[in-house]
């Protein structure tokens, strides 16, 4: 299983991709159940569900309602455990406890990040026997993480990141003890990885997938090579098109941490571009709880329009004081170096169509526009591209 507040779909897609392209024998043709579709060469899109002939099932484990605690995985991957879905869990302590419960059901190894405070809190609460069969991957050193409780540390060397190549490159350092467990010899391994998808958050996702594949029996080199051919999960930094020098990208990010990681990746991929964001909040409860965090994350962009909230399972009447302006108001206390000429960098426009047209009118060649959110904001990429084309015809 692959669980976590963020990165589940990308990591489970990556693991499935690695097994499809590098798995042999019983690992070949895995089954997978993923909460999204997978981008394939030539613009093709693969369905997120597949019943394969192999012996492995890769399952994205959604934590939103606690149902992932019913799973009994052989390997449990936890990409992070930053608090979310507090409408269900009530508080961070119960949210963390659910991940501890999920990890405890793994019959084999647990693979989790050490770069996330929530995941580290989970590690500290694991049963000692579970902690000892946990693999922690991180850009941090052991002393920065704290007591590993017998877990094995796999370091990600981020010094080899490259913005100029258009790929995210890094090295995964696998200690000899883990290499031996995976049947890969008794020496330390240094695996160079080059991803087509940007951002250090994706370097972590890829590392988790590579480690899980190694534990299943894929050779380290083959796993790393397969990861390098992965084009991404749909709606994860997905290119929608380019019109008159303006690039439009779509992303599913709907939590402050995801948005922050997305915009960090955007700055790496487009270091000299103006970054504009059309953001649709998802859930009134999440907007209310994380309004300031949303504002801080969005401040990494140059220009932001927040649209009306996508309600999903909630009703506006239950949250009469929550709207797009909740985030805009919270942003008034957030410093911003790239404010527009009138001194503002963020505004609220409830109507998505109007907001998309407004953002398109502001664009200049080399700008990059992101449509961001878990709702129907994804449809606005085409609207923006059409508006850009019409403006220059």
Model-found features: residue ranges?
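Phosphate-binding loop of NTP-binding sites
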Residues: 1-133, 207, 214
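Cofactor-binding loop segments of dinucleotide-utilizing enzymes, especially the Rossmann-like FAD-
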Residues: 5, 35, 113-114, 139, ...
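ATP-dependent carboxylate-amine ligase
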Residues: 26, 100, 128-133, 179-184, ...
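Beta-strand->loop->alpha-helix junctions that form or flank phosphate-binding loops
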Residues: 33-36, 128-164, 195-200, 224-228, ...
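Residue-level marker for beta-strand->alpha-helix junctions and adjacent short loops that shape enzyme
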Residues: 37, 64, 83, 117, ...
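Short, charged/polar "capping" segments at the starts of alpha-helices
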Residues: 40-42, 116-122, 142-146, 285-286, ...
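Acidic-glycine-rich active-site phosphate/pyrophosphate-binding loop
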Residues: 162-189
